[in-house]
UniProtKB/Swiss-Prot annotation:
The lineage of its organism: Bacteria, Bacillati, Bacillota, Bacilli, Lactobacillales. It comes from the Bacteria. One of its GO terms (biological process) is double-strand break repair. Keywords: DNA damage, DNA repair, DNA replication, DNA-binding, DNA-directed DNA polymerase, Exonuclease, Hydrolase, Nuclease, Nucleotidyltransferase, Transferase. This is DNA polymerase I. It comes from Streptococcus pneumoniae serotype 4 (strain ATCC BAA-334 / TIGR4). Residues 302-465 form the 3'-5' exonuclease domain. In addition to polymerase activity, this DNA polymerase exhibits 3'-5' and 5'-3' exonuclease activity.
Length: 877
């Protein structure tokens, strides 16, 4: 007999998460009657994902019955102060219940009780009846119910990403049992539920108290023995409040529910009525997935499989998709391609058609409308086909419209399309089972992808136009894709023998450090084992336990723990040194060797559509993460050399570009003046913040502190974060920040204004209309909202800086082509561009690169680019 599985869903919180997961597409999700449908759609996607993964035999969705519960009777302010529920969300709630009815899923609410109590009660009943239980919620309150029979999953991102809590996982993550999780909430309180807790007790302090005393009751039993402190005073004063908070936070597992497990059997949906409901909501893709006949849906896709190409199959309006079987288009295989012409769709797996004179000539002379141009240009270059810059890149268009989701065609289909598309993992399989099916089925899958691209292209164009983002696509992202493709194709020469020499040298250093660690430890052990290291440090050597936390797997030996221990224990400094050199050895010195191809070069891939700020990232391998602060990390750059003997590498790096952008955006007169006068910005800041009259009187420590404040402000740092960075008290850090804002009022005004704007719009923009969506900017959770506010402050700065570098790269590429230079752009790392320059062009090129970067855009402060050249990247940096 199959195991009984119960799926319990906190409907109120999951629906709320679904609403905000698709909040940025709110206006797109409307049916013909004008009803917003994003929460309904997102809720259905979550349900489908859970049903497929959990395969429950029984299921219930529990809802809150109203604002008045037994908890509000004992504490009137319970859940007080919550923001008003958006009307666009409230209007969808009845239809979510209707969706559940058509899906054959029981839903239930109970007067005077919350959804959590219904779930808790059914959870205990199901345990007694031998069920395996999965609980799903958007709030962490239900974590207290996890045990050997019950997994609690908390939605993290979008509609399909969850964090699964078991007792072991909770112990590993927080060092707590499920019962202690309730006590933690009693101590901390919960702003989203308006549970008071104990004054000034946060998560870290709460966990520390519980690890020492076991429970809330244990804390108060031992309170007399605690040393006098403000925390002790708060615990004593708020004792009644703490126990009230525990009662409020504890789920009632004996609620008087009027349903039983026998009422929750899941038998599947009412297909006919669910299909009608999808029609009413305008969910055409879901309707197709349900495979219900509809006048709006064709029975099968009309496309033509071709083995040869003629001119009448091609048009300047054709849309192309080239299918790669794998991720790395430098090495993985092209397996087929599809294109449109008028209302016809063509598909083939005959790669030799790329050499057909008619087709090759068309591809090389036409600016293509395509999905993922950079991939296609690099791929087709391997077949001797040299593409021009694109006319329209559908993948980049989607990225500019929304950075919340990935940019795969299946995602584009779900957000903007009507054609039902199976995602690649489902279609091809994964791991060792990944394979291409028989030809007709495979080409039909490609044709479905093309159908999505054809139907969504005009939608994406219209939305970009509405957002004022067409210039961002046409003048920045698409030209940049062309430049990046050329850089990737060029690659950079890497001397494997240099890496092998470094590997041998590092092995000696690692062996020496290992022996020194053994001597200080008084025994041999596995230095790479966190568990063995934890036992050695905290049991055998007796280092203070307050520096770590103990989980089920042992003592934490994370970097932050070791860094705090290093000043009092010489062995810890050696262990930190060991870890650094071992990481450099495995990840870079050895790791990079695997990425050197037959031409002696590394061809990294620049991911243009990943980050939410617009910054580029680098993969296969990641060259942006090569350590720059440690000399052992910098030495790796010695292996990166020019391809030709009579050439050098030239590195040009923007100086303090984010602070310059901050000066421009904030219009702060003092920051602008400092940059315009060419002052050392950190010295200038130190003088204003610390009241120093002359630059010569600014000490190295003053400048270091000012630098930390300058860059901290860019990232919305708190007094807590700054105090950690500088090793000072939070009071001192707060004083630094307060004085900074007094001395630079334009910056404070900018920060306040950009957060206000983000709350109103739900997003922020760079100088070039690049958007960063902030669905959590109005969150009821203080920490989540605070992170969104810091993101709102930083994103226009970091994003604008990234955009300026992109403009410089595009202009520099144009200048190199126009001048007929042999110089090639090879790498882009953070704010740096690396070029290979023939020595005969070096003088002219240094002037050209510097001028191009510094004149890429006109700001209210000058842009400065610093240059260095050398025989290796190390020397050029």
């Amino acid at each position: 007999m199959d195991k009984k599985k119960l799926l319990l869903i906190d409907g109120s919180s999951v629906a709320f998460r679904a609403f905000f997961a698709l909040y940025q597409q709110l206006d797109r999700f409307k049916n013909v009657a004008g009803l917003h449908t994003n929460a309904i759609y997102g809720f259905q996607l979550m349900l489908s994902h859970l049903l497929e993964r959990v395969e429950p035999s029984h299921i219930l969705v529990a809802f809150d019955a109203g604002k008045t519960t037994f908890r509000t009777e004992m504490y009137a302010d319970y859940k007080g102060g919550r923001a008003k529920t958006p009307d666009e969300f409230r209007e969808q709630f009845p239809f979510i219940r209707e969706l559940l009815d058509h899906m054959g899923i029981r839903h239930y609410d109970l007067a005077q009780y919350e959804a959590d109590d219904i779930i808790g009660t059914l959870d205990k009943l199901a345990e007694q009846d031998g069920f395996d239980i999965t609980i799903v919620s958007g709030d962490k309150d239900l974590i207290q119910l996890t045990d050997e029979h019950t997994v609690v999953e908390i939605s993290k991102k979008g509609v399909a990403e969850f964090e699964a809590f078991t007792p072991d996982y909770l112990m590993e993550e927080m060092g707590l049992t499920p019962a202690q999780f309730i006590d933690l909430k009693a101590l901390m309180g919960d702003k989203s539920d308006n549970i008071p807790g104990v004054t000034k007790v946060g998560e870290k302090t709460g966990i520390k108290l519980l690890l020492e005393h076991g429970s809330l009751e244990g804390i108060y039993e031992n309170i007399d023995g605690m040393k006098t402190s403000k925390m002790k005073e708060n615990l004593i004063n708020d004792k009644e409040q703490a126990f009230l908070s525990k009662t409020l936070a504890t789920i009632d597992t004996k609620a008087p529910i009027a349903i039983g497990l026998e009422d929750l059997v899941y038998s599947g949906p009412d297909v006919e009525n669910l299909g009608k409901f999808y029609d009413e909501m305008g969910f055409k893709q879901l309707k197709q997935a349900l495979n219900v006949s509809s006048a709006d849906v064709s029975e099968s896709l009309d496309f033509t499989i071709v083995d040869q190409i003629s001119q009448d199959m091609l048009s300047e309006e054709s849309i192309f998709h080239f299918e790669l079987f794998g991720e790395n288009y430098h090495t993985d295989n092209l397996v087929g391609f599809v294109w449109s012409c008028g209302d016809k769709l063509y598909a083939t797996d005959k790669l030799e058609l790329l050499q057909d004179p008619i087709f090759k000539d068309f591809l090389e002379k036409t600016s293509l409308r395509v999905y993922d141009f950079k991939k296609v240009k690099v791929l087709l270059q391997r077949f001797g086909v040299d593409l021009q810059a694109p006319a329209f890149d559908i993948r980049l268009a989607k990225y500019l419209l929304s950075t919340v989701e990935d940019n795969e065609i299946a995602t584009i289909a779900s957000l903007y399309g009507q054609t039902y598309l199976v995602d690649d993992e489902t279609f091809y399989g994964k791991g060792v089972k990944k394979a291409i099916p028989e030809r007709e089925k495979f080409l039909e899958h490609l044709a479905c992808k093309l159908a999505v691209l054809v139907e969504t292209e005009p939608i994406l164009l219209e939305k970009l136009s509405e957002n004022g983002q067409l210039e961002l696509l046409y003048d920045m992202e698409q030209p940049l894709a062309f430049v990046l493709a050329k850089m990737e194709i060029a690659g950079i020469m890497v001397k494997k023998e240099t890496l092998l020499e470094m590997q041998a040298e590092n092995e000696l250093v690692i062996e020496k450090l290992t022996q020194e660690i053994y001597e200080l430890a008084g025994e041999e052990f596995n230095v790479n084992s966190p568990k063995q290291l934890g036992v050695l440090l905290f049991e055998k050597l007796g280092l203070p336990l307050e520096y770590t936390k103990k989980t089920k797997t042992g003592y934490s030996t994370a970097v932050d723990v070791l860094e705090r221990l290093a000043p009092i224990a010489p062995i810890v400094k050696k262990i930190l040194d060991y870890r650094q050199i071992a990481k450099i050895q495995s990840t870079y010195v050895i790791g990079l060797q695997d990425w050197i191809l037959a031409d002696g070069k590394i061809h990294t891939r620049y991911v243009q559509d990943l980050t939410q700020t617009g910054r580029l990232s680098s993969v296969d391998p990641n060259l942006q993460n090569i350590p720059a602060r440690l000399e052992q990390g910098r030495l790796i750059r010695k292996a990166f050399v020019p391809e030709w003997e009579d050439s050098v590498l030239l590195s040009s790096d923007y100086s303090q570009i984010e602070l310059r952008v901050l000066a421009h955006i904030s219009k702060d007169e003092h920051l602008i003046k400092a940059f315009q006068e060419g002052a050392d910005i950190h010295t200038s800041t130190a003088m204003r913040v610390f009241g120093i009259e002359r630059p010569d009187d600014v000490t190295a420590n003053d400048r270091r502190n000012a630098k930390a404040v300058n860059f901290g402000v860019v990232y919305g740092i708190s007094d807590f974060g700054l105090s950690n960075n500088l090793g000072i008290s939070r009071k001192e850090a707060k004083a630094y920040i307060d004085t900074y804002f007094e001395r630079f009022p334009g910056i404070k005004n900018y920060m306040d204004e950009v957060v206000r704007e983000a709350r109103d719009k739900g997003y922020v923009e760079t100088l070039f209309k690049r958007r960063r969506e902030l669905p959590d900017i109005n969150s009821r959770n203080f920490n989540i909202r605070g992170f969104a506010e810091r993101t709102a402050i930083n994103s226009p700065i970091q994003g604008s800086a990234a955009d300026i570098l992109k403009i410089a790269m595009i202009q520099l590429d144009k200048a190199l082509v126009a001048g007929g230079y042999q110089t090639k752009m090879l790498l882009q790392v953070h704010d740096e561009i690396v070029l290979e320059v023939p020595k005969s062009e070096l003088v002219e090129m240094k002037k050209l690169v510097k001028q191009t970067m510094e004149e890429a855009i006109q700001l209210s402060v000058p842009l400065i680019a610093d240059e260095n050249e050398g025989a290796t990247w190390y020397e050029a940096k």
